């Protein structure tokens, strides 16, 4: 989730937890029952989509998931609400194990945030060993 720290800081953790539950529910409604949705921790979610063969279909689903973050709480949330950035890694092309796919999805996530947040990016081999300075500075400053 983009800018979620501001929600907890300004509206409190109880409100933030309610937003997380709502967003999780909305994500689940955007995917099939055979897909897997989980919260990795903090403000990060993971979605495993099975048997989607077209990049267009994956892009459409990523857009639907981003739309799920247009929360019913948007008016209460400062600075225009929350949004999400999505990093996408494909099995088996980007990796054959969970760790490889997570690492590459994370690299794609950083690329999506670099594009301006509230969007998605597919992993690309050019991301390997690439530094993402603004994201790294956010992490270092605790944002």
Predicted feature residues:
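Glycine-rich ATP-lid/hinge loop adjacent to the conserved G-boxes
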Residues: 35-36, 73
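Histidine kinase transmitter module recognition
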Residues: 29, 72-76, 112
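Conserved long alpha-helical elements within nucleotide-processing catalytic cores of c-di-GMP signaling
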Residues: 2-32, 38-42, 46-47, 53-63, ...
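ATP/adenylate-binding site constellation spanning eukaryotic-like Ser/Thr protein kinases
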Residues: 1, 42, 117, 125
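Residue-level recognition of strand-loop junctions within catalytic nucleotide-signaling folds
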Residues: 9, 48-53, 70, 91-92, ...
